[in-house]
Amino acid sequence: MNETVANNKETRGFQSEVKQLLHLMIHSLYSNKEIFLRELISNASDAADKLRFQALSNPALYENDAELGVKLSFNEEHNTLTISDNGIGMSREEVISHLGTIAKSGTAEFFSKLSQEQSKDSQLIGQFGVGFYSAFIVADAVTVRTRAAGLSADQAVLWHSAGEGEYTVEDITKESRGTDIILHMREDGKEFLNEWRLRDVIGKYSDHIGIPVSIQTRVRDEEGKETEEVKWEQINKAQALWTRNKSDISDEEYQEFYKHVSHDFADPLLWSHNRVEGKNDYTSLLYIPSKAPWDMMNRDHKSGLKLYVQRVFIMDDAEQFMPSYLRFVRGLIDSNDLPLNVSREILQDNKVTQSLRGACTKRVLTMLERLAKNDTDKYQTFWKEFGLVMKEGPAEDYANREKVASLLRFASTEVDSAEQTVSLESYVERMKEGQDKIYYLTADSYAAAKNSPHLEQFKAKGLEVILMFDRIDEWLMNYLTEFDGKQFQSITKAGLDLSQFEDEQEKEKQKETEQEFQSVVERTKSYLGDRVKEVRTTFKLANTPAVVVTDDFEMGTQMAKLLAAAGQAVPEVKYIFEINPNHTLVKQMADETDEEAFGRWVEVLLGQAMLAERGSMEDPSQFLTAINSLLTKG
């Protein structure tokens, strides 16, 4: 290695999040400690990718050493394991930035989700991406020697830490480009100071790495005995997995490659590997994770596919190839048609990019369609993890709106459960004769939806209603207006018409009752004034005296709540007050001749209706006064 210590040594403190991560990782990932090798080899592979990319415009960065690879050696006497690469390397500033801090958005949120429960924590830490810090699972101290490509030998850096509160960084001289990571192994990490143990782990985790991973081994004589001479022996295939034939790749290899590109610990739910030739030549390898990333709902978090051009790594998190509602998809795309000097800005308006985005989107949706059709249980697993972001699809992807809609799942009155298992396709298949609309109800919770008074008439007529209680649902329904030629109809809107399910005798009776109650409606409207938009009778209720509904083109209650929660200005919602003339309480109100007492009845019935609809009211004290007055009178 021929490094000599120079000067400018300083001791620095770790960022507080690094301390937390180190502590949690050492304790939570102890049972799966061999993953440190996967992480460090994966980092070395990334360093080689980055050098290749930068050398496209500056070949001198290779420094006459273009054969990139990773080398592992160990020294039992000194109790060290060394992982060396001749990739891009790091400058002093980069060492401090990458090895002393966690430069990720949402770090505080990540730590708040940790439960101190080992199995759950290890899963979350895996999703977060432990990378370099995984070295401390098996080492009680780590030394890093590195020189960035393009810098002189005396601009190399030595970093050292015992994994506690501090680390040191100093200038050294290092002739070779790249990074050496020297692990000073713990007692329980010494199992990795063994050639066959290392071979086993490399074969398990790193066979798919696109550069050679070699191990230092002793040369054997003709009799098979070890000599003092050592050599480097390549352990892995060193062929990029996605360039191989699908028939030659095992499920285990696909699963390990997923863990390499995603830094996830769990196996993926499913994947799709495709090579396309024609107008656009490209290979895609797309994975659906089995668990949602911890920061999936943070739309600002960078996500996307790895982009390669002609097998040369270009960038991570290329979000241009996948719509935002599929931001959980992991994997890569390798294009033969994009220029090697492509940038994020060029990708933005590139026709090839648009074509690849469309193809990858269809590929993922087709994968999910097959899963939904062939394995209902597995699809439900997917929906529980990713259903919320899938509901962003109809607004974002007009071209695939019907396809996305067919993948959505909801609760409904047909199934007595909060589980979202009902597809729109199955709802349409069960529609009653004469039914031309898909009925739905939005609410704050499943319990609120299930017990909504708006459902009473639908239950009586045997009409299924989709129950929506995710915060995003009301917003979703602004964009999802029809499915399979059937319009959606909110059952809390004033324009709801169920007359096609009523006989002529029933209609005639309702008309008579409506006329008889006209004076009660007018008295109620006179009392309420402009507090409501309108007062009218309704025959949609059975056990409830009154409800409030919104006009067809008025903002709904749940949408108003969504905007308010987001801190946006919300226009006042003017409700239509509907009273049930067949209910005992409404009849009592109608019989009341004293206008002051009549007003108290109106306050109670309107208050009840507002509570059922909104879960709150503007003036609870007025409502309570009216109730107390009526109870006292009784």
Swiss-Prot record:
SMART domains, alphabetized: HATPase_c (SM00387)
Keywords: ATP-binding, Chaperone, Cytoplasm, Nucleotide-binding, Stress response
PROSITE patterns per record: HSP90
InterPro entries in the record: HATPase_C_sf (IPR036890), Heat_shock_protein_90_CS (IPR019805), HSP90_C (IPR037196), Hsp90_fam (IPR001404), Hsp90_N (IPR020575), Ribosomal_Su5_D2-typ_SF (IPR020568)
Residue ranges of the region described as B: 345-561
Tagged with keyword Transit peptide: no
Gene Ontology cellular-component terms listed: cytoplasm
Region of interest (A), residue spans: 1-344
Cellular compartments annotated: Cytoplasm
Gene Ontology molecular function: any one: ATP-dependent protein folding chaperone
Location of region: C: 562-634
UniProt main location, coarse: cytoplasm
Family membership: Belongs to the heat shock protein 90 family.
NCBIfam families with a match to the protein in the record: PRK05218.1
Subunit structure: Homodimer.
General function of this protein: Molecular chaperone. Has ATPase activity.
The protein, known as: Chaperone protein HtpG
Organism: Vibrio vulnificus (strain CMCP6)
